[in-house]
A protein has these predicted regions:
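Alpha-helical scaffold domains
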Residues: 26-242
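N-terminal amphipathic/hydrophobic targeting modules at extreme N-termini
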Residues: 5-7
């Protein structure tokens, strides 16, 4: 394992290394550490790593291993079934981009609503890029819409960029159909943030609303309630999605 770890980007995940006195027995934290590390090493692709680094320029390229998403998804399915999966989920912050991707895929498989919310809230503060965010599904919140809506309302008030983006995503994914209420538009309009990815999500929300709630969304667009950038971007995305 030591030789394999040397292939990872410099400075990545001392969490993988066996510590003095630890035994790599099944069910212990060290076992899942080494298994995740071995998986990343064996599936690393330098060319893909360079591609990812260009695609996600706001994160340190040294934290990207270069493992493709289908491989991560496949590995995460097995990871989620392990008795020691909680050891991996608790090891925040992770040292690599790929660990964050795995984390998103693992918690997406949680079916207990309260546990899922707990894992989402534990992980969201460590989400720092659009690619990891896009893998963090909110569909598991659908069985309990009242509680999901209350959480979305609270997350909108967060100081953290991707927590706010996730809240808007919940409103977009779960509350633009039969559960829609016009007041939700006011919630999203009321989000005033400088971050590009928050404002892009606001625009995406209204683009989806134009398709799913056309009368209500068109009235908001026509009213001038949106800032100019979000107004124009929402219309652009709506046109592109036709």
């Amino acid at each position: 394992m030591a030789d394999g770890l040397s292939l990872l980007p410099l400075g990545v995940s001392s969490w993988f290394a066996t510590r003095p006195g630890e035994k790599a027995e099944k069910g212990e934290a060290v076992a899942i550490r080494e298994d995740v590390g071995a998986f990343l090493v064996s599936h690393a692709d330098e060319g893909y790593r360079a591609f990812q680094a260009k695609l996600i320029p706001n994160i340190d390229a040294a934290t990207i291993v270069g493992v493709r998403t289908p491989e991560l998804r496949k590995f995460a399915k097995g990871l989620a079934r392990r008795e020691d999966a909680g050891e991996f989920l608790a090891a925040l912050p992770h040292g690599t981009f790929e660990e964050n991707q795995l984390h998103s895929f693992v918690i997406a498989q949680e079916r207990d609503f309260d546990k899922l919310v707990g894992e989402i809230e534990r992980f969201l503060p460590f989400v720092d890029n659009w690619a990891t965010f896009d893998q963090l599904s909110c569909r598991g919140l659908a069985p309990n819409p009242d509680a999901a809506l209350a959480k979305a309302r609270a997350w909108l008030e967060s100081d953290h960029e991707y927590t706010v983006r996730f809240a808007i995503g919940v409103l977009m994914e779960l509350f633009l159909d039969e559960r829609f209420r016009p007041e939700f538009f006011a919630w999203v309009i009321g989000v005033s943030r400088p971050e590009y990815y928050v404002n892009m999500m606001r625009a995406w929300y209204f683009a989806e609303a134009l398709a799913k709630q056309p009368a209500a969304a068109e009235a908001v667009i026509a009213s001038g309630a949106l800032d100019e950038w979000t107004h124009n971007k929402a219309i652009q995305k709506a046109v592109e999605s036709r």
